[in-house]
Amino acid sequence: MKRLCFALTIPLALLACGGREMPDDQGLHQDIVNSSSGAEVTFDATLLSDPVESGGHERFQVKDPAGDILEIDHNTTLAASVPAHAGDALVIHGQLYIDPGPRVGVHCTHAETSSGCPYSGWIEFQNNYYE
């Protein structure tokens, strides 16, 4: 019995350690309040507008649970398009940017890093990852 428990513990530990980041909605809100442009964020979102393709990017607006509205800039030359529509739920992992205005958004939502994207990101929709 001890061997069975030990044998099951290792795969479960690896799965837990190798998983994706969990949403931190309050952390995102604090990063916005603190103007932490460049922060790595993972958060729940509701799609406010259907994605629009423009210049190799899919752009759309989302609302987080705190009520913040963000622009998502998803590079479709590095990642698959997200087949979502207004009202759909997403989980987004990427880099926060805050431009003058202020315009708040997230980019670097792709697995393949590029200049300006220090880490990989993704968008989860209906248990599928677009990265």
PLM-predicted stretches and their roles:
Residues 17-131:
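OB-fold and OB-like single-stranded nucleic-acid-recognition modules
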